[in-house]
Regions:
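N-proximal low-complexity "stem/linker" segments adjacent to membrane-targeting elements
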Residues: 1-25
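Short aromatic/hydrophobic "clamp" motif used to bind/position activated sugar donors
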Residues: 82
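A conserved acidic beta->alpha catalytic loop
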Residues: 25, 40-48, 89
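Short, acidic, metal-binding catalytic loop of nucleotide-sugar glycosyltransferases
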Residues: 24-33
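Glycine-rich, basic loop-to-helix element that forms the pyrophosphate-binding segment
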Residues: 60-77, 137
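Acidic helix N-cap motif at the loop->helix transition within catalytic regions
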Residues: 17-21, 45-52, 94
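Conserved donor NDP-sugar-binding/catalytic core segment of glycosyltransferases
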Residues: 90-123
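Acidic donor-binding loop at a coil-to-helix junction in glycosyltransferase catalytic cores
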Residues: 161-168
Length: 181
């Protein structure tokens, strides 16, 4: 079985308290062919230095996640597939393997990866409660997609700050099916 390359692009800004756990979760993936790209937004903490411990593909670019993600994809990523993560996300060990399998063997050009909110602080519990009412297709944008799909829809709209993932999700739905992991 071949294992097409998956490019994981992480947009960061002052994420020294989160980025290491995110990157550790990527190193623990059962899927064997992953490149990690971190695109930082001028962090004033140790985010950049921590990321360099895990990958040499760490760049300082962009003012918003849209710009950062587009830079990571258009200028750096070599994979057949791309996964977009935020620095405070942690992947289960089989997440990448499951995404590739579903996309290779199904009729999907992209996948929603539901987020599970962890932690015990008050607002974390509120967020977890709120998210319990939604499925992955309602509140999350597609996080795993074919690079060719990304190119076809023109990437992220760099004029949008905030709901850029919903915008690209809408564009992807116009050309194909999005599955749910």
């Amino acid at each position: 079985m071949t294992h097409p390359l998956v490019s994981i692009v992480i947009a960061t800004k002052n994420e020294e308290n989160n980025i290491e756990n995110c990157l550790i979760s990527i190193t623990e993936q059962t899927y064997p062919n992953i490149e990690v790209i971190v695109v930082d937004n001028n962090s004033t903490d140790k985010t950049f230095e921590i990321a360099l411990k895990f990958t040499d593909k760490v760049f300082n670019k962009g003012l918003e996640r849209s710009t950062q993600r587009n830079y990571g994809m258009a200028k750096i990523a070599c994979g057949k597939y791309v996964m977009f993560l935020d620095a405070d996300m942690i992947l289960g060990p089989k997440a990448t393997e499951a995404c590739v399998s579903m996309t290779e063997n199904g009729n999907w050009i992209a996948l929603h990866i539901p987020e599970f909110v962890l932690g015990t602080k008050y607002f974390t519990r509120v967020r977890r409660f709120e998210r319990s009412f939604y499925n992955g297709t309602v509140i999350d944008g597609a996080r795993f997609l074919k690079k060719s799909t990304f190119v076809e829809v023109g990437g992220f709209d760099e004029t949008i700050s905030g709901p850029e993932d919903w915008d690209i999700d809408k564009k992807i739905k116009q050309i194909g099916n999005i599955g749910l992991l």
